[in-house]
C-alpha cells in the first residue's frame, strides 16, 4: 500500500497567484476527496481538509473554463471498451472548437456507479459518478455528499426559482449503514437527473466544475491519487481472478460429470442396437435378485419348430392296441403261476 499523502496547509491570500498561474496543479489527495469548487463569488474553500485553492472569476472568464478541484480518484473510459485511459486532449482544441462538444445541445445524465467508504485518515463516503460528454468520451469523478450539498447551495443562489431536492442528512444514526447509503445514492441520482433536465442549470459554471466538463481529469493530477487507484484496481483484479478460478473448477467438474453421463448413454444405445440386429424375436426378462441379474430367454420360433418335429414323428410310429397288451400280460401271469405250482 502507498504511504498516505499528507496535505500541507497553504495560506490563501499569499499563494493565490501561484495557484492561478499554474492551472494544472491540484491539491486533492486520497484522504481528501472533497476539495472545493468555485462559488458564485469566485472563491474556493474546503472545510473538510487543510488543502485550499483560490481563483477569481475574472481569470475563469478569460480562460473560458475553470479548474475542477474536487475529484480524487479519476480516470477516463473510452466507449464500451474495458481498457482504461486518461483524457489527453488539449484545452485549446476544446476552446477553438466549441461546436464539437454536444453537452450543451444534448446533456447526458451523469450516472452514479456506486459508493465507497474510505478510511485513510477520516472515515467518509465517496460516490463514483460516470460523466459522458459525448458517446466517445466519458470519465469518472468521485464526490462526497458535502460536494452535492455545496453545489445545491450555489444553485439556489444562481437560480432562486428552482428547487432541487437533496436526500436529507442523517444526524443521530450510523451514516455508513448499507441500506442508508443505497437510499442516499438513489436520492443523489435523482438530484443529477433533475439537474441536467434544465439546460441553463446543466450548462452553468458550478455544474461544469462539479462534473469537470471543461477540464477532464488527466493522469498527472496527483501521484497519490494514481497510486491509490492502481491499488484499488489490483485488489479488484485479485478478487476477480479468484472468482474466475472457482468458476473454472466448477465448469471442469460439470464437464466431467457430463462425460460420464454421455458414456453411459452411448453404452445403452450400443446394447439396444445389438439386440435389434439379432435374428428372431427374443424376449428378455431381467430381474435383480440377491445382487445377481437373472436372464431368461425363450425363442418362439425354436419352440414352434420343435412342436412340428414331434408331431411328424408321431405319425410314423405303429399304433398300440390296448386289448392285445392286456391279453399278453394275462398269459404271462398265468404261466408264471403254473410254473410256481409245479415247483411246489
Curated annotation (Swiss-Prot):
Bias type Basic and acidic residues, positions: 88-105
Localization (cell): Early endosome membrane; Late endosome membrane; Cytoplasm; Lysosome
Keyword Nucleotidyltransferase: no
Membrane topology: Peripheral membrane protein
Ranges annotated as biased composition (Polar residues): 14-26
Superkingdom to which the source organism belongs: Eukaryota
Assigned keywords, A-Z: Coiled coil, Cytoplasm, Endosome, Lipid-binding, Lysosome, Membrane, Phosphoprotein, Protein transport, Transport
Binding site for a 1,2-diacyl-sn-glycero-3-phospho-(1D-myo-inositol-3-phosphate): 144, 146, 184
Chain intervals with Pro residues compositional bias: 1-10
Protein name: Sorting nexin-16
Organism name: Rattus norvegicus
Amino acid at each position: 500500500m502507498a504511504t498516505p499523502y499528507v496535505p500541507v496547509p497553504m495560506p490563501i491570500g499569499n499563494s493565490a497567484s501561484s495557484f492561478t498561474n499554474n492551472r494544472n496543479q491540484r491539491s486533492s489527495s486520497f484522504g481528501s476527496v472533497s476539495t472545493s469548487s468555485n462559488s458564485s463569488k469566485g472563491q474556493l474553500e474546503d472545510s473538510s481538509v487543510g488543502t485550499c485553492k483560490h481563483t477569481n472569476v475574472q481569470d475563469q472568464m478569460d480562460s473560458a473554463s475553470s479548474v475542477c478541484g474536487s475529484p480524487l480518484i479519476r480516470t477516463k473510459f473510452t466507449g464500451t471498451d474495458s481498457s482504461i485511459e486518461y483524457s489527453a486532449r488539449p484545452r485549446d482544441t476544446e476552446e477553438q472548437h466549441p461546436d464539437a462538444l454536444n453537452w450543451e445541445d444534448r446533456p447526458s445524465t451523469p450516472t452514479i456507479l456506486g459508493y465507497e467508504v474510505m478510511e485513510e485518515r477520516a472515515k467518509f463516503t465517496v460516490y463514483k459518478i460516470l460523466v459522458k460528454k459525448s458517446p466517445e468520451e466519458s470519465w469518472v469523478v468521485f464526490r462526497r455528499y458535502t460536494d452535492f450539498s455545496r453545489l445545491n447551495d450555489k444553485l439556489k443562489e444562481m437560480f432562486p426559482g428552482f428547487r432541487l431536492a437533496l436526500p436529507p442528512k442523517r444526524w443521530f444514526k450510523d451514516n455508513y449503514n448499507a441500506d442508508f447509503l443505497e437510499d442516499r445514492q438513489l436520492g443523489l441520482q435523482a438530484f443529477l437527473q433533475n439537474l441536467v433536465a434544465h439546460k441553463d442549470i446543466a450548462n452553468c459554471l458550478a455544474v461544469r466544475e462539479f462534473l469537470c466538463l471543461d477540464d477532464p481529469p488527466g493522469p498527472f493530477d496527483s501521484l497519490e491519487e494514481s497510486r491509490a487507484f492502481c491499488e484499488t484496481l489490483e485488489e479488484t483484479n485479485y478478487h476477480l481472478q479468484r472468482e474466475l478460478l472457482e468458476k473454472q473448477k466448477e465448469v471442469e467438474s460439470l464437464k466431467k460429470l457430463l462425460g460420464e453421463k454421455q458414456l453411459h448413454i452411448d453404452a445403452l444405445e450400443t446394447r439396444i442396437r445389438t439386440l435389434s440386429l439379432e435374428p428372431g424375436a427374443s424376449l428378455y426378462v431381467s430381474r435383480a435378485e440377491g445382487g445377481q441379474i437373472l436372464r431368461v430367454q425363450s425363442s418362439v420360433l425354436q419352440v414352434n419348430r420343435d412342436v412340428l418335429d414331434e408331431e411328424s414323428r408321431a405319425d410314423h410310429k405303429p399304433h398300440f392296441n390296448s386289448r392285445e397288451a392286456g391279453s399278453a400280460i394275462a398269459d404271462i401271469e398265468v404261466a408264471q403261476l403254473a410254473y410256481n405250482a409245479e415247483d411246489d
